[in-house]
Amino acid sequence: VSDQVRHILAMNNVDEILFGNAFATEEEFKQVADVMKEVYVHVDKVTQFGEMISNILPHGDLKRLPLGIELAEGVTDTEKEILHYGSHQVSEYIHYMIRSRWTRLFYKNADIPCRDCGKEYFEKGDVLIVNNNLSFYKAEIQICMKPMKNTGQRNLLGHISKDALCILDLIHKGDIFTITE
């Protein structure tokens, strides 16, 4: 049910969700409520980077798409903190990845050593963080859209569930999302 609600929200053209054909269980209503708690949030304006940056950072009352992740083994506490940074904004949507660059501004001094995940190629739905080996982009969160060679510049944080992969195709530049476990 939670992936279905995320999919409906990603379509960005639904005002109301009705359940029919059978009674929803308490667990299903709880799943819907948990997703909806992540959707509408208020984010204060960040001023530490100057007026120009503070005006383009997402702030105010926001609607964001919560994406569920199956966390990979070995993710560090620093990587988890960056991953769960409140609201990611799609800065670029290129054919092979979704990029959320604001975390690299807030976490530019973080230490993110390279971790081997044992994969030669990342696949659609893999959630990545740029590590110390690509310092200019370090701490940027990326979501793979197509197979991409693992060059040692990104660490695997986890994977969007198979049932929710279709949601990624509905995300566009400027959309705001958050990562949940």
What is each stretch, according to the model?
Residues 1-67, 76:
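Catalytic alpha/beta core domains of metabolic enzymes, predominantly
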Residues 53-181:
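C-terminal functional modules
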